């Protein structure tokens, strides 16, 4: 059944699957950043005087959370364009 699959085709197929899974890593940071922004907006609504502190803390937290998504994108791009293990 799998006798006609070449090594190159198998590696490229696995790379595509891995890239798809790596892109899924972007879902978590997106949801987390949306929740954080919503809570920050609610906090500023309750206490407008704390706008600067809330905004700076939110942006720092979102920058840290975004690194996971960026690493997933980097892994996906490497898997799709570098063609690992191929001569």
Language-model features, listed with the residues they occupy:
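Hydrophobic, small-residue-rich transmembrane alpha-helices and their short perimembrane loops
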Residues: 1-87
